Amino acid sequence: MKGLLDLFKQFTPDEHFDAIKIGLASPEKIRSWSFGEVKKPETINYRTFKPERDGLFCAKIFGPIKDYECLCGKYKRLKHRGVICEKCGVEVTQTKVRRDRMGHIDLAAPCAHIWFLKSLPSRLGLVLDMTLRDIERVLYFEAYVVVDPGMTELKKFSIMTEDDYDAKKQQHGDEFVALMGAEGIQKLLAEIDLDVEIERLRGDMTGSELKVKKNSRRLKVMEAFKKSGIKPQWMVMNVLPVLPPDLRPLVPLDGGRFATSDLNDLYRRVINRNNRLARLLELKAPEIIVRNEKRMLQEAVDSLLDNGRRGKAMTGANKRALKSLADMIKGKSGRFRQNLLGKRVDYSGRSVIVVGPTLKLHQCGLPKLMALELFKPFIFSRLEAMGIATTIKAAKKEVESGTPVVWDILEEVIKEHPVMLNRAPTLHRLGIQAFEPVLIEGKAIQLHPLVCAAFNADFDGDQMAVHVPLSIEAQMEARTLMLASNNVLFPANGEPSIVPSQDVVLGLYYATRDRINAKGEGLIFSDVVEVQRALDNGQVEITAKIAVRLTEWTKDKESGEFVPESKLVDTTVGRALLSEILPKGLPFANINKALKKKEISRLINTSFRKCGLKETVVLADKLLQSGFRLATRAGISISIDDMLVPKQKHDLIERAEKEVKEIEQQYVSGLVTAGERYNKVVDIWGKTGDEVGKVMMAQLSKQKVEDRHGKLVDQESFNSIYMMADSGARGSAAQIRQLAGMRGLMAKPDGSIIETPITANFREGLNVLQYFISTHGARKGLADTALKTANSGYLTRRLVDVTQDLVVTEDDCGTDAGIAMRALVEGGEVIESLRDRILGRVTAIEVLHPETQQVVVPAGLMLDEDTLDIVEAAAVDEVKVRTPLTCHTRFGLCAKCYGRDLGRGGLVNAGEAVGVIAAQSIGEPGTQLTMRTFHIGGAASRAAVASSVEAKSDGHIGFNATMRYVTNGKGELVVISRSGEIIISDQHGRERERHKVPYGATLNIKADQQVKAGTVLANWDPLTRPIITEFAGKAKFENVEEGVTVAKQVDEVTGLSTLVVIDPKRRGAAKVVRPQVKLLDAAGNEVKIPGTDHSVTIGFPIGSLVQIRDGQDLAPGEVLARIPVEGQKTRDITGGLPRVAELFEARTPKDKGTLAEMTGTVSFGKETKGKVRLQITDPDGKVYEELVPKEKNILVHEGQVVNKGESIVDGPADPQDILRLLGIEELARYIVDEVQDVYRLQGVKINDKHIEVIVRQMLRRVQIVNPGDTHYILGEQVERASMLDTNDKMRAEGKMIATHADVLLGITKASLSTDSFISAASFQETTRVLTEAAIMGKRDELRGLKENVIVGRLIPAGTGLAFHRARKAKEEMDDAERRSIALQEAEEQALLTPATTAEAVVGEEPAPPPAQ
């Protein structure tokens, strides 16, 4: 009976494992797995379809092909379970053992495993200290390797050709041993003594950098072998395991052909060659034949393991490369990504979606037929429970016949059972939401209009998938966490996601506009009901201005009850009627204005913060209903007459054409270069297009009407097109400009701008040429979109992979580190206020009042909307907040450092997978980012033309710390710093605006003066960059030779001549000298820089126009030379997605700038051929020098004092330099600002903390600078958390700890270098990751989400984190219990046998224990 029960006991996998280890298998291990040796290459008998004995599908080895039946049919049925048939040798058992029983092949000659040979760096090469080329020559029988030199002069490990070998053999006879093939390699590997090698390498860590690097690499591999207990000779195999046959099936097709897995072909080839080799060895065949066969065997084994890794790939009959074992697991269609990370799911369906305007937010319409299929098991169980069907079979029949009772049961089953809807591509967590199904007729799923924004769905044929959560736990999670009405905020930025759009916005906007002199204007009503009556009877129009008495409910501070308060309000009919839908506690002022899309969003946000989730969802639903109704009633439509072409358009275009003609004239007479002409023309047309757009909008947006008193007044226009754009329902000013203004400039496919614009608009119609020019851009747009989607998806994948294991694991790590946040100000505009930046963060230290120094906000408090009101009132301009970057939690993050969970509005919960959320928030808008990189012109050139800054507000002038200026001969202040900024602060000392001022600008203000708004603070020439002297003196030219280093240019029109510095590449002679100017004082001595003995030397860069004469007297601030900006290389501004990817991959930019390595004084040493030697001397006299190419623009001059990390050579910054010189905080600031710049340009809002989370993951590894007493190796990169753990251990033992330097890894690198080999292997470079892991005998602790998904456990995030914690706690308790029981037993044993213990102590013969 017990056997029978065991039989029905379900096959349960081993639940309890905490880690997975990977290693190399020894030959004994492989044999122990095996159920028999595969000796023949035959597969199955094509007539009987039975497997051949000893072949690749042998039933004796792998198990029976029919359940509980042996091959010859002697034993059938369950009663013979476990019997081995004496006739055919097959065990009688289930056929599914053919999925896990392995076989083996005994190789007649050893074969090297190709992964350890060819996967770079070659592990075999590292262990043997031989080059890959040499090992290959030995393995493939082209050369001998010396295994035992004996008493000869030969060296072990040395390589010899066949001729050498013959010569040496004749000379020395059998004194030495040299071998070919894998045997030789295996022998060498077996003779390596790991301990001795490790000692030797550890002692040999000095000398050249290359040697240290090589030794540390070898040491790492040796230590790995030693630690994991793996013997190096196992990298060469004597036994080959054979995959279970059901994993490489052979399926008979009709017509006598077979479909087979490629592995069978590869195995057959190995077996054939192996058998042939064995026979040749038996026959003692000539060496050369045997050798060839061994080589072929090695090649066959190579292709089986990884086809195409070395040499040509083996091909099948149809010339396509065979799919080897390695190909099975790697790539998108490999085991990891196809089957383990992305599975097909049962209980799911998909259909087209249609709009369901009558649904509530938490509902979706589910077609009846689909529901019937999806909920089948629930219906069956219900039918059985009600006694309508006795068996499942009967229930099935009942359902198929479709009796009315089935539909009733379906209604019952579906009640309160949420289903999940998903729309591909699922770019963020709102791409899957749960809804309560409502049964509908038809075959399309109905979707609530408000969730379309989150799904990015529209109803032009989109499809969605439905999934049914089965277990009670799954239903509960779907209900509490995923229900659409619980997800009303975007996790990326905390804005509401259920904002109405399009028709709804238009309806609400129209109804809340006011029209002058509408019917019923000036009436006063007693309540809203009366207004509704008047509207219904046609006595008032919906846009009429009226007064009405409204009741507002305000919350009482003490009791928390709502108290009514009624007052007379000036409003319009539409707004008064809308007031009905406001929840209690939301003031009428929120809708007493024209509701545009932004306003509606703000309304929903305010409602969420003030009235809570439930009220907000109800409000959103009501807004939706009203909006649709009002839009229908408004009857807004557009006609061609709504597109008003501005009257001034003709004049503006004529003026522009005149300007362009002038420039053409200048170009012909040689005043401007071709490039300047193009830029200016493009600029003129760009400006004209904007102006036409401006006058058009001005004309569209206003209309003249008579008011009640018969006067003509302006009012905002009721033009349909204008209303659509103004409300945010559809279209934008730019699009209206194309309809009624002018289309403007078009781009060529390569992104450069065509200088002849399209002056027509769509209202007037385009001519053939204009239409043709338009097609360029339109087609490129479509092609770009396709590329963009793929690139964006790949970026998201990399981001998710690098952050997937970051989960909130504790409440507070107790640090007070953080970053100081202030408002983001650029060019005098506040781009992002302090409030927006710190909302939802936790304060790191107390926030003090700037004047009274009292505590405004204590440390460790989350800044919500109310707290921020207090902060703003106190005029605080800098707050230090906690950040994921400085969180001290080892594995994971703490809630305080993360702050508010943006998708829910409260402090983040433990178990929230913040890493994945960050990755999704950054990746999701990726498709909106432009791929097109702006070339200078059009968009970018207009920014460059700024030539002055003016104050935007009244205030007090201050300069930043790096601002430096001199007074020139005319008494003007000239800026000589590169990063100077003017700061304007208000009377509280709060910074209001900040303006960057370029080198060479003239200041019109002094420090500490008061200015009025509109004052011009500074101006400069935007088209040239000056070079200015700080000191007075007489100019003395050096190396300025006409025709050699400079050329004289004479202007044909004006006749003036200027000197231009020639590019050294074009010079005939004097290629290495640099034209420069020194200054002499009155006595004729060189002027020195104060405080140094360096003379003032100012170089003229390439292409600069020299503005002074030799011997001229100069005052400080005088311009020595100008560099035309157009002459500078116009660097492409990498924009959009590629820029984001570049930042997260931490790539060093090309033409990168140089930062000062230390604080000190600049000097120039001896120059080399094309480079300048730039030196920095610190106060202690230490010198750092760097060679800078001459064509680079050096931003410093001799004798200037620079600070560590300051820019000294022009160019984009390298993130690695920023980290090294300025630290983590500066690096984070740089990456966050740069990424935000790209997204801001597209109008995408992302919270800073998401980017910080990614930066934390990029910094998660450190490089060991000094290993101390730890087991680390110098220069090794290790996980930060594990290093800190090791150091804690060392401290506890009183040993020396390891010191480290921070390392910044790009996201791809960081994903591949995680401690989890399962996660890394499923990401990219599977072979390399697994090879490395196998040699190191790595354990995967299954910490991240991905590894757990792959091994099929609950993920350690969300509810899964609690489950894992509970499981661990229970295991620990069980362990403790087991130990205590064992102790108890031991004590009892001891009490039973007192004599034995005592005697044993004395040391006599112990007495035999008493008989029990």
From Swiss-Prot:
Residues engaged in binding Zn(2+) 2: C813, C887, C894, C897
Cystines in this chain: none
InterPro entries xrefs: DNA-dir_RpoC_beta_prime (IPR045867), DNA-dir_RpoC_beta_prime_bact (IPR012754), RNA_pol_asu (IPR000722), RNA_pol_N (IPR006592), RNA_pol_Rpb1_1 (IPR007080), RNA_pol_Rpb1_3 (IPR007066), RNA_pol_Rpb1_3_sf (IPR042102), RNA_pol_Rpb1_4 (IPR007083)
Keywords assigned: DNA-directed RNA polymerase, Magnesium, Metal-binding, Nucleotidyltransferase, Transcription, Transferase, Zinc
Cofactor note: Binds 1 Mg(2+) ion per subunit. Binds 2 Zn(2+) ions per subunit.
Pfam families: RNA_pol_Rpb1_1, RNA_pol_Rpb1_2, RNA_pol_Rpb1_3, RNA_pol_Rpb1_4, RNA_pol_Rpb1_5
Group of enzyme by EC: transferase
Residues reported in the UniProt entry to bind Mg(2+): D458, D460, D462
Enzyme Commission number, as recorded: 2.7.7.6
MF GO annotations: DNA binding; DNA-directed RNA polymerase activity; magnesium ion binding; zinc ion binding
Family from the record: Belongs to the RNA polymerase beta' chain family.
NCBIfam families for the chain: rpoC_TIGR
PANTHER family: DNA-DIRECTED RNA POLYMERASE (PTHR19376), DNA-DIRECTED RNA POLYMERASE SUBUNIT BETA (PTHR19376:SF54)
Name listed for the protein in its UniProt record: DNA-directed RNA polymerase subunit beta'
Organism field: Methylibium petroleiphilum (strain ATCC BAA-1232 / LMG 22953 / PM1)
Designated gene of the protein: rpoC
